[in-house]
Amino acid sequence: MATASPVTDVDVRHDYLLRLGDDALVLGQRLSEWCGHGPVLEVDISLANLALDLIGQATLLLNEAGDGDRLAFHRDVLDFRNCLLVEQPNGDFAQTIARHLLYTTWQYLLLQRLTQSRDKFLSEFAHKAVKEVAYHRELASDWTIRLGDGTEESTRRVAEGLDWNWRFVPELFEVDETLQVAIDHGIAPDPREFEDEYRSAVAAVLSEARLETPAEQRPILGGRRGHHSEHLGHLLAVMQFLPRTYPDATW
């Protein structure tokens, strides 16, 4: 009987680059959907800038993993390794902010530790990206507080956004065999080590916003293994349409 091939350092590094790159790419594409649709001009511009930061991060990571354009535009849904949280629909503005708070709080804590990676590229990337993500986290926190401590409707909407996205948080701290090898080799930080700090940081924002921490729900996992929701398929159909329709086009 054939045995599975052992996971190599090259495989682990490539997979980790895809995880981080796909997170940034998918969330950047999601936020770009707000362009021209923000509740006010200032917010519209802010969300577009967040999207540009994330697409920039994705470009660096996917180009390091291989041909960035091909990885972004010519992979199928099952080949993407992003977490499920970032592919969730924008919903209304409050739901978008809730999703961004939950993701960027995790991303910020991860990048802080990734600066100590033994991998030179990842360490240098983290030193640059953590400054951008600090702003993302601040914006998401500020808007969560404004919405939560605002009108009855804004409070309801952001609470519903948190409830919707909360089930996807446990996946951020899941460690599978591939990630464990990356941790053991000093490539990636162990997310379990900052889960308590993450939950405390989110709880502090929610307390200031006069919001309750959502009740624990059955976690939904699988994004890191290519098991995605239908929402990612719809997103990729839009994002990949031109490159797949005209694969040899140049402009």
Question: Model-flagged regions — what are they?
Answer:
Residues A2-Y16, H74-H100, L147-T151, N165-A188:
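Acidic/His metal-coordination segments adjacent to aromatic residues that form catalytic metal sites
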Residues R13-L17, G38-Q57, T96, F121-V133:
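Alpha-helical scaffold segments that form or flank carboxylate-/histidine-based iron centers
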Residues D23-L31, Q57, L61, Y103-L110, ...:
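Amphipathic, well-ordered alpha-helical segments in soluble domains
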Residues L27-N49, Q107-L122:
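Helix-loop segments that flank and shape redox-cofactor active sites
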Residues A51-V77, S141-T144:
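Conserved alpha-helical segments that form or flank metal/cofactor-binding pockets of metalloenzymes
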Residues L85-D142:
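Internal, conserved structured core segments that host functional sites
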Residues F121-H185:
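A contiguous pocket-lining binding segment that forms or flanks enzyme active sites
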Residues R156-W251:
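Extended, helix-rich structural scaffolds rather than catalytic motifs
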